[in-house]
Amino acid sequence: MTMHVEVGPDSTAPPHSSGIKVIIIGLGIGGLAAAIECHRKGHSVIAFDKAQELKPVGDGIALAHNAVRVIEKWGKGTVGQELGRLSSRLNTTVIYDQTGRFIAEDKLDGFKAGEGHLLPRGELSQVMYKHAKSLGIDMRLASEVDEYWEDENSAGVIVDGEKITADCVVACDGVNSKARRHIIGYEPELRSSGSCVFRGWMTTEEPLVGSHWLLSHTDQADQVKVFAGDGVHVLLSTIQHGKMVFWLCTHKDNDCYDRKKEAPPTPEVDGMIHLIRDWPMRGQIESTIRKTLAKNVMHYPLLIREALSNWRSKGGRMVIIGDAAHPFLPVSGQGAAQAIEDAAVLAITLHLAGKEEVPLALHALEKIRLPRTALLQRSSLELERFWLNIDWPEVEKCPELLTIPRPKWIHGHDCQTHAYTEFAKVVSAIQMREEYHPLGGPRDSTNGESLLALLRQDT
């Protein structure tokens, strides 16, 4: 009996109907999304993570509309509804200078209710993990991969001495990926972006004395406030109607990465306060972040890699996605979203190519996804540098320069419809060994046009 399987961006397939077995390494946001999306398209999934358990910890994470439109299809909409209950209720980000003078309002397009989410990172991963378990996906924790291998017909891993065989291996093990070298054959250079970041979070179960300026009116909407100075900017945000406060401070530091090789930066609030010691707004900001427990403070260099030219192994049956392939700076607000886009497109290209053409599916995934992520990587670095080298006379003329560009080609992107639309064109380009020109996105940069200008293209 032939099983009819609907094909389209909203379609699902019966479990295990494709005959394709996928091994997923890493159960962060990207890995969980890959497991769920592959299951939805009828692929058999076995996933591994070295963690003993997936703990519901972490600070805030932004999930933009281009990712939420994927998640909203899970569990007949129930997963999206649950995230909506956990998410902040955002209206605007208010931007000030270091004296507290109002500069501009950012309308947060793509993150408002019904569009995107700002929520605790740990709770997002827990909701995704719970949904994956409800689907019966085989997920194995406390599992360390010892070896990666592939041949003409299969690929797999050796985990704790056991050889696991599949049609392909998908590594989603983060920016410090151990799989990456085995898959693409080398370890790309990691270098400093020229800046470091302090991050911290706290709950408001105990009253935060001196924080009324941030917590007032959170019964109506959560608050996001940004303070911009010379070489330093600070963001404070409430989450879940003021139940949690998340903050970060990004600052110039060209030597932070080199010092980290000798000793990690000290993750102390004092270090962050020192950066704003001369700010008129210091007292107000300090009154809130002083409540952060030491265990909830991080301080680390913001590292970058040049966009990779290839995500696949030589044999074509192993691939890296998410932060393992394209780490983003926090200012982009797209790290999680791009990992989820990768996951959705992976499941679709495998579905369309079929079991006999798995290497072609992974090649098509790379062709569709790599140009978009490479452009976003480069533009996020330019955006970060703009914020740390603010041209105040220009901002005086146009305060909107300090708002974060959120063009339709990023936040309005439907990665699933795009994959179905482009798949045949991509396959033809691969088979004919021709250059593939992606549909959609910004115009190519010409006449010295900056990447930041491309970000402001609302196409």
Curated annotation (Swiss-Prot):
Pfam families: FAD_binding_3 (PF01494). The keyword Flavoprotein applies. SUPFAM superfamilies: FAD/NAD(P)-binding domain. One of its GO terms (molecular function) is FAD binding. Its cofactor is FAD. The keyword Lyase does not apply. Belongs to the paxM FAD-dependent monooxygenase family. This is Asperlicin C monooxygenase. It comes from Petromyces alliaceus (Aspergillus alliaceus).
